[in-house]
């Protein structure tokens, strides 16, 4: 008899925890296009603007292990509530950041916001895995993760329709060139104040939504799911055991490269489109199309897992991503942009599948193992500034630098494909 993906007693808690996946998806994807916005309005190079992503995902690296230790000592619910509190604080800090018009203040706000996201991901992912039979854990997490892109596409839509379309700094002349850099300092200051307020407002609204979710989960009685390692093994012992498990160890590496490819493809699609003459808002609309493909592929790939091994599908989809990125690099013009959009169709199963493969069979070390996989996110955050540095070159090896910069996602897909193959055929 096949094990159920989700038992009836877990439905309401599952729905509440799954809503968190949409919340961090929203934060991720309203933030991605802000790299291009800060680059223009603060008049900084792409490499410096990409520090937005380093700050955003750096919070994961800082807080993943503390979040795991906190959840182990108290409970998954306590970890989730603390995560929501930090999330709200970071969002509300956008108000003073916009008032003072300091780029580094925005970075600090994002850094604190992602302290909260680290708590949420470190606790919500293993909580979902624990809500039922271990045999269906990866399918259950893939299903829960299916709602993450719903938050993502909402964040993209808000960025496109409520922020990017209202930016004074993105006004162009008849030839399609930005005019912001040609204005007087007084005009720039006025526009900067206006545009930073446009950036600020969605984050403030988001803060209030997070507070509401905090109250709902705080008042709801959640099922007690045992956290195996609490009080049983030391931190050092858990780390030692994890380091000896090749499937886990290599999974952390693969996860870092997956996060890198996701951030780079969804952040720099705007710059790729701008080089072709599109506005930031139009570039973000292409990102929304990519996310729609991502969502559709998520549900399709989750259904296919009933018939195909997760490890095999991971390898297959990584090869597809590799081929589409080749088009991004070597096909100039709008067809290269279409290849970049298509790449999103190969990405949706990767994060939860790597997560499920790496954690499968772990017991006492499961929460700390989850923290290690969340920490891997910061590894991916190191890649966007490097891609920004390539873009700043203008041209590399006869190719537009923005095209050539996608050699980094190309390498990422190679690493993921190798992990999928090894997990399928070699690692036990």
Curated annotation (Swiss-Prot):
Gene3D superfamilies: MFS general substrate transporter like domains. Disulfide bonds: none annotated. GO terms for molecular function: fucose:proton symporter activity. SUPFAM superfamilies: MFS general substrate transporter. It is a multi-pass membrane protein. It is found in: Cell inner membrane. InterPro entries: Lfuc_symporter_FucP, MFS, MFS_trans_sf, MFS_TsgA-like. The keyword Disulfide bond does not apply. The keyword Cell membrane applies. It catalyses: L-fucose(in) + H(+)(in) = L-fucose(out) + H(+)(out). GO terms for cellular component: plasma membrane. One of its GO terms (biological process) is fucose metabolic process. Keywords: Carbohydrate metabolism, Cell inner membrane, Cell membrane, Fucose metabolism, Membrane, Sugar transport, Transmembrane, Transmembrane helix, Transport. Belongs to the major facilitator superfamily. FHS transporter (TC 2.A.1.7) family. Mediates the uptake of L-fucose across the boundary membrane with the concomitant transport of protons into the cell (symport system). NCBIfam families: fucP (TIGR00885). This is L-fucose-proton symporter. It comes from Haemophilus influenzae (strain ATCC 51907 / DSM 11121 / KW20 / Rd). The gene is fucP.
